[in-house]
Amino acid sequence: MGGRVEALPRSFGVLLAFGFGAAAAAPLPAQTDAHLQHSLDSLVQGFHGTVGIYAQSLKSGHRAGVNADSVFPTASMIKVPILIATFDAMERGQLDFRQELTYTDSLLYAGDDILGAARDSSRFPLNKLTLLSITTSDNTASLWLQALAGGGAAINQWLSDHGFSVTRVNSRTPGREENRAQYGWGQTTPREMADLLVRIREGKAVGPAASEEMYRHLTRSYWTGEALSQLPPWVQVASKVGAVDHSRSEVALVNAPSGDYVFSVITKDQADTTWDPPNEGWVLIRKVSALLWSHFEPRHPWHPAPGAERFKP
């Protein structure tokens, strides 16, 4: 089964039709990195599912992508806009970073979450919820934050007001039941998800001080086995992973020696629904991350040490 790649807009460069083994060229815009575009196109061929990728150097503006503006499930990447909306509520005085909150069993989202193991009536500061949501991808903490930030409708209003036309919270959001049935908790595009991290990096999501702390949160990921595994551990990276049965995803902004770059990789309709490291979606994310490091940092070659996979969660 060949990789299914949806058509890109003409402004993005290449129309691919892997199902028929053919590709029709379209004019490349000035900022498209033709070499990187070719490398990404080659990398996704044969993938058993649909792939979306967006990559951009923040220094040069050069970019490339595959299905960069197509709609994909966010899975746990939706926790990035939830984080932004939570900090926006803090900025407006509706929440406080240090305020104490009481956990009740009714908040539990069944799974392996740290917060879900807490006793009823336990107390937590808001900043521990944001930490758990981003660092360990705790679902119970994230759904609690979604409610504290005003719910999915309020988060979606922030996204709409700030120019994000596709990225939306679907779960527990009235009127978005059909979207939830198709995409799950949230939906986005590779380009929009990358842009969310860029807004935070540039201090333009909420205010500069809030953006700084959000960025610190995003650089503390527990999940180092995919995109992060292909990057030197001494290089700072802000990232968020996501996964559901038929989709794997990760967005990362790399503070590389030669200049920042951002990328987002999302799959959908994956044939491989296994949860082990060889999952085809995880493998693709690792390959994209390694390719981008080599492309943007040719003077700083790096590869994981033999056996590094033994020390990944």
Please report, for each region that a protein language model flagged, where it lies by residue:
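Beta-lactamase-like hydrolase cores
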Residues: A26-P73, L291
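Active-site SXXK
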Residues: G61, P73-L101, S133, F263
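Short, well-structured active-site flanking segments
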Residues: D88-L107, G152, G207-A210
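Mid-domain, small-residue-enriched loop/turn segments at the edges of structured enzyme/sensor domains
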Residues: T130, L143-E202
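Conserved catalytic neighborhood of penicillin-recognizing serine enzymes
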Residues: L108-W144, G152, Y183
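Bacterial N-terminal signal peptides
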Residues: S11-A23
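Structured C-terminal helix/loop/strand segments within mature extracytoplasmic catalytic/sensor domains
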Residues: L28-L43, L148, G152, D195-G225, ...
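Acidic helix-start/capping segments at beta-turn-to-alpha-helix junctions
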Residues: L58-K59, F97-I114, A149-G150, R176, ...
